Design a protein with these regions (language model features):
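Active-site-proximal substrate-binding groove within the catalytic cores of carbohydrate-active enzymes
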Residues: 3-63, 71-175
Length: 175
C-alpha cells in the first residue's frame, strides 16, 4: 500500500502526514463506535426514563414513537445484592411498553415475540440469514409469519451496496 504505513514497525517517524496540531494522521476503522463504553440501565431506570420521554412527546402532540434497545435486549443482572433474571427484565419491559402503547402508536426495532402484541410496526426486519456454513437455502421465515399481521420495515436501503438485489429481497419477503 503506497498510502498507509504500519506504525508498529517504528518506521513512522518521518514521511507521514501530520495534522495541524502536529499529531500523526491515523486512519480509524469505519465501523468504530462513537463512544467506547456504554452502560446498561436497570429496567426500572429505563422504565422511568421512558415514561418521561413519552410524556414529553405526547404533550407536544407526537403520538407515533419508535423505540430501540429495550425491544430486543434481555439480560440478567445483580443489583444491590439481588439477582434478576431475564424473565424479570422481560416483565418490567412488557409492563412499561404496554402502558406506552396505550398512549401512542409504537414502532419497535426488532422486537422479541413477547412484545409483538404491543407494537404497531416492526422496524429493521432481518432479510438475510445468519450465514452459518451449514445453511444451503435462505427462507425469510419471520417475515412470512408476520406478513399481514404487522407492518414490517427493513433496514436502511441507502447503506446497501447492491440496492437492486436488496429491493428484490424486500419484495420477496413482503417487507
Amino acid at each position: 500500500d503506497a498510502l498507509r504505513i504500519n506504525p508498529s514497525t517504528n518506521a513512522a517517524t518521518f514521511n507521514t502526514i501530520k495534522k495541524v496540531n502536529k499529531r500523526t494522521f491515523t486512519e480509524e476503522e469505519a465501523s468504530a463506535q462513537v463512544y467506547d463504553t456504554f452502560y446498561f440501565l436497570t429496567p426500572e431506570r429505563s422504565a422511568n426514563m421512558l415514561e418521561k420521554f413519552v410524556s414529553s412527546y405526547t404533550k407536544k402532540g407526537v403520538n407515533n414513537l419508535a423505540l430501540a434497545g429495550i425491544s430486543n435486549s434481555l439480560y440478567s443482572y445483580s443489583y444491590k445484592g439481588n439477582y434478576y433474571t431475564r424473565y424479570d427484565v422481560a416483565d418490567t419491559y412488557s409492563s412499561q411498553i404496554d402502558s406506552v402503547s396505550e398512549e401512542t402508536n409504537l414502532l419497535l426495532e426488532q422486537p422479541f415475540a413477547y412484545l409483538w402484541d404491543y407494537t404497531d410496526a416492526f422496524l429493521d426486519m432481518p432479510l438475510g440469514s445468519s450465514d452459518y456454513m451449514y445453511i444451503d437455502e435462505e427462507v425469510p421465515f419471520l417475515s412470512i409469519v408476520l406478513k399481514g399481521v404487522l407492518p414490517m420495515y427493513s433496514d436502511y436501503v441507502n447503506f446497501e451496496a447492491n440496492k437492486t438485489e436488496f429491493f428484490l429481497q424486500m419484495v420477496e419477503s413482503g417487507v
